[in-house]
Every structure is written in structure tokens, then in C-alpha cells.
Design a protein with these regions (language model features):
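Short amphipathic alpha-helical segments
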Residues: 20-21, 90-91, 216-218, 329-331
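Short helix/loop capping segments that flank catalytic or ligand/cofactor-binding pockets
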Residues: 88, 213-215, 225
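Short, composition-biased local secondary-structure segments
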Residues: 134-144, 203-209, 294-302
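C-terminal region/appendage detector
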Residues: 1-6, 23, 31-36, 72-75, ...
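Residue-level signature of catalytic and energy-coupling elements of molecular machines
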Residues: 8-9, 18, 78, 171, ...
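A short acidic Gly-Thr/Ser loop motif
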Residues: 9-15, 80-81, 196, 204-211, ...
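Conserved phosphate/pyrophosphate-binding and hydrolysis machinery centered on Walker-type P-loop NTPases
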Residues: 157-160, 322, 361
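Nucleotide/phosphate-binding catalytic cleft detector across ATP-hydrolyzing
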Residues: 1-15, 19-202, 259, 307, ...
Length: 481
């Protein structure tokens, strides 16, 4: 087995996926191993709710990968997503002295102020710069421009603090170091969207089991991100009204369900078998499926900010397991009135693999492959020997790689989520900077107070009388001389 590889883990609502692979010089990816664990008992709507069971799933994922790779794993890349992730705009204003030339330090200051914003029970995972307002004009890169008034417009991506803390706790308890955390929707977007689609304006919809994630890009920049707590699993749950268990409902959905069926093509005599003794009319089955699909599509379209609804020249891109439902693209065309709809069955990178989960090209592996593509540090550890009598001291050891400490501004808008350690370091740096600024402000205030006291004394009545008396004495002496 290779001595170097990258490992990524996706925390999905229906399954947890682990993948190991190598990035080749030609830009392609070679997948070395893929494993899965059922996560339905510990992750709901993409959010961890049972820490112990999640730790066990993570441990099993790593154990399976190590057995295949015959090597230890020192760290992993992790995708962050799920319910309650949302984006919110924030504007930071700075008035400048007349005709000030904007420097990179000024831009960094705006970014720092924005990053240190606080939201009740929310954590800022990332902040994507939208644009800058220079006096009355908008610019993407304002450095070097003269102005009196500077505004930074940012898109802050928020998540519940306890959800963020739970992820860090699970990996700590499972003793699995995190190489880097990424916003899963952004990692996937970079792998399935073209640069042209991002520039022209597009809507990316990831149709998952428990959630549907909507991302909007325009002029190459992320403009909106939201997660809807609805997915393909809701269709399955609706079908249980036929008095069948969820596993059987899922099988029926995969075999018979279509997102849209022309009413003229519905055969009133056609029945679908539920079990060996029961059937359901195809018309009733179709109504159940279509009602939920329409709700998901309408909710996804409702997420699009009004100012971008007419700027989606790149169209709508569908991905995820739910995009495999026949006629799903037609439903999106009908409800959004956008004819340009593409189904992204696979990532844009060339991927070498014989694993059916990869070669099926069904959209279910796009996120974890996107995470793998983001990796740039070796995750391989010691080789695991199979010879019980070999000298363990002679085993080759792979060098561990760790990223140097970074300022959050370096990765802003790229989907990189600070780990708990990085966040603690950033918070400490922000605290020290705030203390320094407060100390400077106090010194300035004290100096101004001293000058004011001096002016006050100079303008006091006694001081004026003393100055007048001194002047009188001086003038008198001059006359006598």
C-alpha cells in the first residue's frame, strides 16, 4: 500500500462515509478505500445528537479503513453540514480622513471586526467577502483606491454552537485528530460546479436523505447558503402510511417513484405490490410521492434571495441521492421557470476507482470526494504489520503533517472551518488585540484629559489675573528702565 494518502469523512444523516485516496500529478484522484457506517441512530438532519454512538461510528470507520490500507491513520478531513446552517449578510462601516488610500491592513481590519461579530447561540463557521463600497461605488478589490467612506459587505455562515462543539467532542473522544474541517456544501460545490456556472450565477441543490442544501453563486462568489430539514427520507416516511415499515417503503420508492407523472399517463388499473398479500393503486402512490417532492422543490426555490432570482444564468444544478429520482429536473423547471437544469451525477475531477459506490456515478459520493479533493496533508501513519514476530521498531513511519497556525482571513470564503484549537488561538489573539486597542484608547483619553486640564487652568480666572499681574509688573519695570 502507498505510504501517503488523504482521508476524509462525511457525517451524513443516513450513513457516515470514510474515504482514503491519493491526488496524482495530473490532477486526478485515485481512491484506495471507501467504507460506510449506518448513522441513522446518531445523526439527524446532518446534526450529531448522540455523541457516544457517533464516536463508535467514527471508530468503526477508521478501523475499517486501517484494515484495508494496512496503515495507521494520523488525521482526517471532516465535512461540516446539516440543519440550522444558514448565511446572513453583515456590513462593517469605516469613515476615513479625506482622500485616504485604502491599504490591505484596512481591509484586514474590516474582516477581523466582522469575524468577531457575535450572534446568540451561533458560531461563525466562515465569512465570504461579497464586495466593498467605496464612497458610492462597489468594488471587489478596493486596495489602492482613494476614498472617504469604506464599507465591507460580508456573508457570514452560521451554525448552532452546540452542534459545532459536538463535532469537536466526538473526534476528541474517538481520539481522531482533525487535519481540517470544511463546510461540506462548499467543498462539494468546488467539485461539481464549473467556473462558468459560478460566474454567470447558479443555484446548487444537494438533495440528501434528511436535508436539502441550497447554495447560490454569482460572479464567482457564494451569495447564499441554507439548509432545509426536508429530503428523500421524508418521501419514504410518507409512504409508510401504506402500513409498511420504512425499509420496505424505501425499496418501493427506489423502484417505482417518479418526481412527476403526466396525469394522462396514469393507468387507473395499474397497482404496485406492497407485500405478497397487498397492493396499492399507482395513482395513490404517485400522489403521495409528488406531494412531498413538490414541497421540497418549493421550499428550495423559496430560499433564493430576491436579488438573485433573475441572475441564475448558469441555471440550476442538482446533486445528491435525491437527484436520482426520475423527472426531478422537470419538477424544478416547472416550479422555478428556469429551463437550464443540470444533474451533477459525479465530480468534475477524474477519479480512478473500481468501487461500485464510486463508479455508479449516482451523486451520493460527490460530497466526500469533494472533501478528499480539498486535502493537501498526508494522513498516513505507521504501517500495520501482519507478521506477529516482526520487530515493530523496524516499521517505516510516515511523517505527520500539520498546518501552521493561520489567520482566519487567509481562508475566508473558502469553506475552511476553524477547529476548536484554531478557534481558541484566534479568540486569544483577538482578546490580546482588543486589550491592546483598549490600552491605547485609555492612553489617548488620559493625554486628552491632561491637555484639557491644562487648557482649563490656563483659562481660569486666577490664572488670567496672575498673567495680567505679571504683565503689569513687566511693563512697569520696562518703563522705569
Amino acid at each position: 500500500m502507498p505510504k501517503e494518502f488523504i482521508v476524509a469523512i462525511e457525517l451524513g444523516s443516513s450513513k457516515m462515509t470514510g474515504i482514503a485516496g491519493q491526488k496524482n500529478l495530473d490532477g486526478s484522484i485515485t481512491v484506495l478505500a471507501t467504507v460506510e457506517e449506518d448513522s441513522s441512530s446518531c445523526i439527524r438532519k446532518g446534526v450529531i445528537y448522540n455523541i457516544d454512538k457517533t464516536c463508535q461510528c467514527l471508530t468503526n470507520i477508521i478501523k475499517k479503513l486501517k484494515n484495508i490500507l494496512k496503515q495507521d491513520i494520523t488525521q482526517v478531513y471532516v465535512g461540516v453540514g446539516g440543519r440550522s446552517i444558514r448565511s446572513i449578510k453583515n456590513v462593517i462601516v469605516k469613515d476615513l480622513p479625506g482622500n485616504t488610500i485604502i491599504s490591505q491592513e484596512m481591509i484586514n481590519e474590516l474582516m477581523d471586526i466582522n469575524r468577531n461579530m457575535t450572534y446568540p447561540d451561533q458560531e461563525i463557521l466562515d465569512a465570504a467577502t461579497q464586495e466593498y463600497k467605496i464612497d458610492n461605488q462597489y468594488q471587489i478589490d478596493p486596495v489602492g483606491i482613494q476614498c472617504n467612506h469604506l464599507e465591507g459587505i460580508f456573508l457570514n455562515i452560521l451554525w448552532r454552537k452546540n452542534f459545532y462543539n459536538n463535532i469537536n467532542t466526538c473526534f476528541e473522544n474517538a481520539n481522531i485528530p482533525i487535519a481540517e474541517m470544511y463546510l461540506a456544501p462548499l467543498a462539494m460545490a468546488d467539485s461539481v460546479l464549473t467556473d462558468s456556472e459560478k460566474r454567470a450565477g447558479c443555484m446548487l441543490v444537494d438533495l440528501g436523505a434528511d436535508t436539502t442544501t441550497v447554495s447560490v453563486y454569482y460572479k464567482g462568489i457564494l451569495r447564499h447558503l441554507s439548509v432545509i430539514p426536508l429530503g428523500g427520507g421524508n418521501v419514504t416516511k410518507d409512504l409508510t402510511c401504506l402500513q409498511i415499515e420504512e425499509p420496505d417503503a424505501e425499496k418501493m420508492k427506489l423502484k417505482y417513484a417518479k418526481a412527476y407523472t403526466d396525469i394522462n399517463n396514469i393507468d387507473p388499473t395499474l397497482n404496485y405490490p406492497i407485500d405478497k398479500d397487498r397492493v396499492v393503486e399507482s395513482k395513490k402512490f404517485i400522489e403521495i410521492v409528488e406531494a412531498r417532492v413538490e414541497e421540497i422543490v418549493e421550499n428550495a426555490w423559496f430560499q433564493i434571495p430576491v436579488e438573485f432570482s433573475d441572475k441564475l444564468l448558469g441555471g440550476i444544478i442538482l446533486t445528491g441521492g435525491g437527484s436520482n429520482m426520475p423527472e426531478i429536473d422537470k419538477v424544478f423547471k416547472t416550479h422555478t421557470h428556469i429551463d437550464k437544469v443540470r444533474i451533477a451525477k459525479f465530480v468534475s475531477q477524474t477519479v480512478n476507482s473500481r468501487d461500485p459506490k464510486i463508479t455508479n456515478h449516482d451523486g451520493t459520493m460527490n460530497t466526500v470526494l469533494g472533501l478528499l479533493a480539498k486535502g493537501d496533508m498526508n494522513c498516513a501513519g505507521d504501517e500495520i504489520g501482519t507478521d506477529l514476530f516482526s520487530n515493530s521498531a523496524e516499521k517505516p513511519v510516515a511523517a505527520e503533517q500539520h498546518k501552521a497556525p493561520r489567520n482566519p482571513n487567509e481562508t475566508a470564503g473558502k469553506g475552511v472551518v476553524l477547529t476548536a484549537a484554531e478557534k481558541a488561538a484566534a479568540d486569544e489573539a483577538a482578546r490580546k488585540q482588543k486589550e491592546l486597542e483598549e490600552a491605547e484608547a485609555r492612553l489617548l483619553a488620559e493625554k486628552e484629559a491632561e491637555e484639557e486640564e491644562k487648557r482649563r487652568k490656563e483659562n481660569s480666572l486666577i490664572h488670567k489675573m496672575m498673567r495680567g499681574f505679571k504683565k503689569f509688573v513687566k511693563d512697569t519695570i520696562s518703563e522705569e528702565e
